[in-house]
C-alpha cells in the first residue's frame, strides 16, 4: 500500500469518527447543538440604531448588535439614560417590544416621551432587590418577545441580604457575585432570543491610586467580560443660548467592541428636553464629508445658504425638513461605504479604560 493510500485511509477513519461523534451529540442534545459553519453561512449582524448617526458609524455595524450584552457607563448626568432611551425609541420604530428595569426608581416618562419613546407600550419594572431585577430580566429574555431591555443601573442592583441587613453591615463582593451568577445564565439566552440587554453603570473613584486612571465601574469584573460593547459617555462642554445652558456636547468612546474595530469615538449634542440633536449631527457630518461648506461662521449646502453660525444652520434644517432628510441620506450613504475604515472616528488606543471594582 502506498503512503498516499494509507494517508487517505487515516483521513477517512478520522472523518467517520467525527461524524459518529456529531451524531452522538445530536442524539444527546438535539439537532443544532453542533454544526459546521458552512451549513449556516455568515449573515449581516442585525442592529438597532442608537439615535446618533456618528455613534452608529463608530460602532461599525450601524448600531447596537442584537443578541449581545451592552454596557453604557459614565459620570453623573452625562447622558447614559438618554442614550439608552434613544435605543428604545429606535427599536420601537422597528416594531420591537422594549422593557426598562428601573432599579433606581427614577424613570421620567415625560422626558422619555419627548425622546420618542412610546411609553404606553414600554414595559417598566421597579424591582425591590437586585435578585428580583435579574430574575425579571431572565423571564423577559426567555420569552423571546423582547427586543431591547435596559437595566438602570448596575449600582442600584442591591442584593437582598444588604437590604434586609443593618445600615452599617459589610457585604463585600455580594453584588459582584450576584452579577457574575446572573450573567453566566443570561449570556446564552440573550443570544438565542436575539435581544439587546443594556446595562447602565456608574463610576466611582478608587482610593489610593497615584498613577493611572482612578475611575472604576461598579459591580465587579463579570460585566466587563460578558459585554460585547462598552460605551464610555462624557460631557465635553456646555451648549449655551446667550447666557442660558440648553444642553451638552457629548463624546462617546467605544472602549470595547467584539463585532467591529474598537477605540472609535463619536461626538453629538444632547439638548435638554429634546435628547440627541440629529440636526446638529447633520451639520457637523455634512461639513466632515464635504456636503456642507463652512466659510468662517457661514454654512451653505450647494446654493442653499443655511445661515451664520451652527445654531442658525440647525434652525434652517429644522424649518426645512426636506433639505435635512436629503443631507442625512447622503451622509448615511457615505457612512455605509466608510463604516469599516479604521481611521474614521478613530481615537488613540490608550490604556485608560476603566477597571472594575467589587462593591
UniProtKB/Swiss-Prot annotation:
Record-level GO cellular component terms: cytosol
PANTHER family in UniProt: MITOCHONDRIAL DNA REPAIR PROTEIN RECA HOMOLOG-RELATED, RECA
GO molecular function: ATP binding; ATP hydrolysis activity; ATP-dependent DNA damage sensor activity; damaged DNA binding; single-stranded DNA binding
Cell compartments where the protein resides: Cytoplasm
UniProt-listed PROSITE patterns: RECA_1, RECA_2, RECA_3
Keywords, sorted A to Z: ATP-binding, Cytoplasm, DNA damage, DNA recombination, DNA repair, DNA-binding, Nucleotide-binding, SOS response
GO terms for biological process, alphabetical: DNA recombination; DNA repair; SOS response
CDD domains: RecA
Species in which this protein is naturally found: Anaplasma marginale (strain St. Maries)
Protein name, as recorded: Protein RecA
